[in-house]
């Protein structure tokens, strides 16, 4: 079991001009070691912004992966229940305070801790607010 944490101040699909995947996105997928990994996008920090979600689905859909979106502003329970299926959890930019508060309320922090301790490679990625959520202090 290996856990990779890849964090950046910005970049990836959300910064590409046409919404296409970047080398960073391909690298994150490659780290999973799976042929068709499940990639979960967590747009919580942006209040589950619909255009951000569409951009993710377009970019990652072209990479031959399976995709899911962790939505906590609507249908949170079902979304959190599916989270352990993810090989890669990619957390988007926005408000770190909102992100952490909603994760605690809905138990996402506990689910992620369990995922990290499992006998399976897990990749955790994030941009901006999504980068800072992986650290304490």
Feature roles, as predicted:
Residues 95:
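Phosphate-centric recognition/catalysis
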């Amino acid at each position: 079991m290996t856990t990779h944490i890849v964090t950046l101040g910005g970049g990836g699909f959300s910064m590409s001009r046409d919404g296409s995947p970047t080398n960073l996105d391909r690298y994150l997928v490659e780290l999973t070691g799976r042929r068709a990994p499940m990639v979960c996008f967590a747009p919580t920090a942006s209040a589950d912004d619909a255009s951000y979600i569409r951009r993710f689905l377009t970019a990652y859909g072209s990479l031959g992966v399976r995709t899911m979106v962790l939505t906590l502003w609507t249908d949170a329970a079902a979304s959190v229940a599916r989270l352990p299926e993810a090989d890669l959890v990619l957390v988007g930019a926005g408000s770190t305070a909102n992100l952490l508060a909603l994760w605690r309320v809905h138990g996402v922090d506990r689910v992620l801790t369990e995922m990290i301790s499992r006998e399976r490679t897990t990749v955790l990625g994030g941009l901006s607010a999504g980068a800072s959520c992986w650290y304490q202090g």
